[in-house]
């Protein structure tokens, strides 16, 4: 093994904050740093990193160690793998012990697979520039906006025919069996033949697999072919481009998610080095956990604006919202992907597009509404209930509450209704809830007419009210047929008996329950009965005069008729002074 002196030299050279900050989001707290522990689920940070002591400790689960131990525990590295990674990072030479001189330490399977992938990557890069048949792949990359510097930066390559690949690997002492273990073959055939190769790296830059894109329309298979699952290639956890974007993501707590590897690399190369893509499979909860470890709070979804892209945005957005991340959906113009949009509009155009992103809930409602052939009240109710069920899983109660309020605003329904649907009150026994019936709207004319009739009906021995009503009005002045019928009956009774009609006899005249309720249910101030009666008479007289004037115009040939009506109205107002005798404190004529 390596000498103790060289290992001590490595330990003293390691900056533990630098190492751990590439994997978790650290926040300074005095002389130490704290974070949510990556080894157990927690919301309050209990994971403390001590730079002076070069160690970490979690007060929640008890995890403890140095940078070497962190890589072993967090990434599953062996001790040898961890020290080799760190020695490369901090440029420290590890010295073999004398007895091991000329002896290569035994390699584990993971290290062997990384070595095979590294050799294959080097060969693929060579093929892209030197094989005649690769010129079409190179032209395709240039056409997509990849410069030679970009191609070199991301180690892009070309997959040759199977026979040439096997020959090259054999020269490097790599057997076909080892290539099968590393995931280069499916059903005995080389997976990446005649395709552009995108190497996939882990967080520390090791080549752990490949994604191969076809560039000729007549090529067989899907657009992308990926390395199958291997001991070092776990698609459910790998975020393509993370080795280039990790630092900025952890620093700014935001990430841009795209669908394809080419899109991801073009985004990073254009300055958006907080971009990643899911590797070959659908975006999963494991991917979300990887982002959570970096402290991501804001997620921008930059997917193709087709049906598949929108469905992916709905699913991925919900996963991120559930992890208490704020999700925004950026809508690309139809027919564009991030790569083509950058080529046409440039970085400034994409920045402007990102600034116009919709929040996830607005996008969700818009997509769901458009999925209905017809969107009516029933569909609206179903959509609100579906959205509520989804929102209730989005993190803390406060976040859920705020999203429910936003839902109410988007769907134009009362907030209290949405909140009650989300949190129904459960009682021990069912209660009879009174159902409020819709109260028919009552016309003001009916109210005025029933006010006059109420005064007449409840005037008792005050026959002056009956006399005044008889003097000023006739049954035809009442518009409602029931009011007209009752007024005629009461005046007829008064003229015959010189007294008020008994209440029960008056009720028998009515067949409309609404009029009877207006006469009996509404409160009547009997002490101000005379005033109420006079005011109601005045309203009735004004209505009658307006109706008489309505058909008239200002034409000269009818001017005399209009003046005649006006004289009648003035006389009518003068005649009201008779009513004021009933109430000395009231002056009806100004």
From Swiss-Prot:
Record-annotated Toprim domain positions: 253-333
Keyword annotations from UniProtKB, A to Z: DNA replication, DNA-binding, DNA-directed RNA polymerase, Magnesium, Metal-binding, Nucleotidyltransferase, Primosome, Transcription, Transferase, Zinc, Zinc-finger
InterPro entries: DNA_primase_core_N_sf, DNA_primase_DnaG, DNA_primase_Znf_CHC2, DnaG_bac, DNAG_N, DnaG_primase, TOPRIM_DnaG_bac, TOPRIM_dom
Binding site for Mg(2+) 1: 259, 304
Source organism of the structure: Chlamydia pneumoniae (Chlamydophila pneumoniae)
Protein name: DNA primase
Zinc finger (CHC2-type) stretch: 37-61
Top-level taxon of origin: Bacteria
UniProt-listed Enzyme Commission number(s): 2.7.7.101
Reaction equations catalysed: ssDNA + n NTP = ssDNA/pppN(pN)n-1 hybrid + (n-1) diphosphate
Enzyme class: transferase
Oligomer status and interactors: Monomer. Interacts with DnaB.
Domain notes: Contains an N-terminal zinc-binding domain, a central core domain that contains the primase activity, and a C-terminal DnaB-binding domain.
NCBIfam families xref list: dnaG
Pfam families according to UniProt: DNAG_N, Toprim_2, Zn_ribbon_DnaG
């Amino acid at each position: 093994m390596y000498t103790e002196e060289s290992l001590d030299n490595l330990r003293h050279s390691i900056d533990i904050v630098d190492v751990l900050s590439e994997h978790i989001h650290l926040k300074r707290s005095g002389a130490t740093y704290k974070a949510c522990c990556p080894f157990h689920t927690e919301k309050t940070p209990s994971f403390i990193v001590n730079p002076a002591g070069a160690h970490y400790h979690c007060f929640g689960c008890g995890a403890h160690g140095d940078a070497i131990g962190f890589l072993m525990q967090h990434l599953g590295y062996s001790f040898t793998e961890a020290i080799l990674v760190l020695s490369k990072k901090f440029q420290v030479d590890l010295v073999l012990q004398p007895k091991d001189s000329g002896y290569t330490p035994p390699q584990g399977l993971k290290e062997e697979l990384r070595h095979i992938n590294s050799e294959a990557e080097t060969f693929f890069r060579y093929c892209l520039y030197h094989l005649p048949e690769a010129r079409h792949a190179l032209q395709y990359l240039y056409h997509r906006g990849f410069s030679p510097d970009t191609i070199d930066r991301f180690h892009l390559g070309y997959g040759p025919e199977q026979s040439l690949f096997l020959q090259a690997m054999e020269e490097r002492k790599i057997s076909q069996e080892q290539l099968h273990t590393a995931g280069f073959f499916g059903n005995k055939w080389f997976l990446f033949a005649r395709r552009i190769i995108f190497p996939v790296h882990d967080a520390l830059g090791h080549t752990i697999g490949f994604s191969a894109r076809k560039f000729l329309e007549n090529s067989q298979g899907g657009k992308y072919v990926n390395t199958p699952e291997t001991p070092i290639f776990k698609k459910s956890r790998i975020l393509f481009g993370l080795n280039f974007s990790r630092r900025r993501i952890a620093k700014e707590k935001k990430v841009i998610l795209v669908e394809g590897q080419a899109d991801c690399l073009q985004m990073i190369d254009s300055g958006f080095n907080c971009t990643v893509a899911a590797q070959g499979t659908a975006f999963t909860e494991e991917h979300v956990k990887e982002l959570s470890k970096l402290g991501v709070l804001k997620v921008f979804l930059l997917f193709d604006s087709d049906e598949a892209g929108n469905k992916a945005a709905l699913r991925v957005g919900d996963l991120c919202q559930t992890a208490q991340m704020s999700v925004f959906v950026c809508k690309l113009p139809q027919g564009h992907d991030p790569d083509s949009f950058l080529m046409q509009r440039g970085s400034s155009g994409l920045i402007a597009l990102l600034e116009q992103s919709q929040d996830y809930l607005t996008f969700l409602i818009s997509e769901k509404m458009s999925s209905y052939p017809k969107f009516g009240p029933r569909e609206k109710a179903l959509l609100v209930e579906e959205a509520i069920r989804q929102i209730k899983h989005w993190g803390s109660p406060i976040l859920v509450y705020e999203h429910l309020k936003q839902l109410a605003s988007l769907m134009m329904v009362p907030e209290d209704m949405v909140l009650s649907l989300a949190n129904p009150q459960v009682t021990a026994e069912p209660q009879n809830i009174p159902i409020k019936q819709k109260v028919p709207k009552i016309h003001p004319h009916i109210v005025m007419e029933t006010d006059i009739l109420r005064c007449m009906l409840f005037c008792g021995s005050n026959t002056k009210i009956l006399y005044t009503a008889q003097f000023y009005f006739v049954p035809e002045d009442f518009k409602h047929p029931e009011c007209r019928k009752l007024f005629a009956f009461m005046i007829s009774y008064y003229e015959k008996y010189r007294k008020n009609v008994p209440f029960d006899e008056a009720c028998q005249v009515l067949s409309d329950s609404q009029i009877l309720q207006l006469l009996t249910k509404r409160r009547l101030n009997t002490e101000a009965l005379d005033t109420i009666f006079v005011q109601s008479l005045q309203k009735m007289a004004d209505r009658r005069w307006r109706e008489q004037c309505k058909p008239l115009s200002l034409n000269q040939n009818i001017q005399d008729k209009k003046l005649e009506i006006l004289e009648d109205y003035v006389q009518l107002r003068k005649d009201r002074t008779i009513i004021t005798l009933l109430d000395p404190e009231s002056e009806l004529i100004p």
